């Protein structure tokens, strides 16, 4: 396990490996983003520090490598910034600024790469925005109301299957856009693209928490069924699955409440292990057994 000490001068809010697992991006209340080269399991090197935000940086998200070396970040300053590394110089620069929100942008997430360079943002102004970065260098965005008191996180659904040749045109792919958001209204909501009105409409409402939902994560792979995890201020994590009739069913990850607030939840790439971090300074790992119950798979003490 690689442990990076003194990575920032203030609280670290996110740490994300790139597609190949070779580079780590971290962000902090010190308003900066650090890029580390990770070599194996023991060594690392700080290669870049990115500054451009005017407030704490909450989250970072790597784009798929087919778009180049691109990173999105979001901040309390109400902006999402898009950074690109020039391969010749290995220098990073801001190539786009998304500033449509009126409050802190709490979450940024790139869509599955088959859908194009599309960024999803969730903000404390209660709105969610979806930004398309078009091939001709232009951008277009859709902004809509999602959670009345504030949107805290958002996560894309995986594509249900590999599109057939006649589904690969832009219009058909756009129809497959789905994501889940969560907010300070104690809810998570699933949204789908509405082509007729060029916006996103609520497909399902996931009710089960009794306090703010801090994070939501849609399992990245389609196994026997699809999973959504929600982590809440109420010290519980819920696992949501869709039954044959299309209705979403909830299950407590564990019958006992967590010792403190559940801040974040994250699926493994294969979608079969869930990591949960909370106010108790621990990261716990969970997996589903053959009986459909979730059981502990270990923990990492910070």
UniProtKB/Swiss-Prot annotation:
Encoding gene, per UniProt annotation: SEC13
Principal subcellular localisation of the protein: membrane
Organism superkingdom: Eukaryota
One of the Pfam families matching this protein, by short name: WD40
Protein name per Swiss-Prot or TrEMBL: Protein transport protein SEC13
Family as reported in the entry's similarity comment: Belongs to the WD repeat SEC13 family.
WD repeats: 7-46, 52-93, 100-141, 162-201, 208-250, 257-296
Functional description taken from the UniProt entry: Component of the coat protein complex II (COPII) which promotes the formation of transport vesicles from the endoplasmic reticulum (ER). The coat has two main functions, the physical deformation of the endoplasmic reticulum membrane into vesicles and the selection of cargo molecules. It also functions as a component of the nuclear pore complex (NPC). NPC components, collectively referred to as nucleoporins (NUPs), can play the role of both NPC structural components and of docking or interaction partners for transiently associated nuclear transport factors.
Gene Ontology terms: cellular component: COPII vesicle coat; endoplasmic reticulum membrane; GATOR2 complex; nuclear pore outer ring
Keywords tagged on the record: Cytoplasmic vesicle, Endoplasmic reticulum, ER-Golgi transport, Membrane, mRNA transport, Nuclear pore complex, Nucleus, Protein transport, Repeat, Translocation, Transport, WD repeat
InterPro entries attached to this UniProt entry: Sec13/Seh1_fam, WD40/YVTN_repeat-like_dom_sf, WD40_repeat_dom_sf, WD40_rpt
């Amino acid at each position: 396990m690689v442990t990076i000490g003194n990575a920032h001068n203030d609280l670290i809010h996110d740490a994300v490996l790139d597609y190949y697992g070779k580079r780590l991006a971290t962000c902090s209340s010190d308003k900066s983003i650090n890029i580390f080269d990770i070599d194996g399991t023991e060594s690392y090197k700080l290669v870049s520090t990115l500054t451009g935000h005017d407030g704490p940086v909450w989250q970072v998200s790597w784009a798929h490598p087919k778009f180049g070396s691109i990173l999105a970040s979001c901040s309390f300053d109400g902006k999402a910034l898009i950074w690109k590394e020039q391969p010749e110089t290995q220098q990073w620069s801001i190539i786009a600024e998304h500033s449509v929100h009126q409050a802190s942008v709490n979450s940024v997430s790139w869509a599955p790469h088959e859908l194009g360079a599309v960024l999803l943002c969730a903000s404390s102004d209660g709105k969610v925005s979806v930004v398309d970065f078009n091939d001709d260098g232009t951008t277009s965005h859709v902004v809509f109301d999602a959670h009345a008191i504030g949107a805290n996180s958002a996560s894309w659904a995986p594509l249900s299957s590999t599109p057939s040749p006649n589904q690969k045109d832009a219009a058909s792919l756009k129809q497959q856009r789905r994501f889940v958001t969560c907010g300070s209204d104690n809810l998570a909501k699933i949204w789908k693209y509405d082509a007729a009105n060029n916006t996103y409409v609520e497909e399902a409402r996931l009710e089960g928490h009794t306090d703010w939902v801090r994070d939501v994560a849609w399992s990245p792979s389609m196994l026997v069924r699809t999973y959504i995890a929600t982590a809440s201020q109420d010290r519980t994590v819920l696992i949501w699955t869709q039954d044959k009739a299309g209705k979403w069913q909830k299950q407590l990850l564990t019958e006992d409440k967590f010792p403190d607030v559940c801040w974040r939840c994250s699926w493994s790439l294969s979608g079969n292990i869930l990591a949960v971090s909370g106010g108790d300074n621990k990261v716990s790992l969970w997996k589903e057994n053959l009986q459909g119950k979730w059981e502990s798979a270990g923990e990492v003490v910070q």
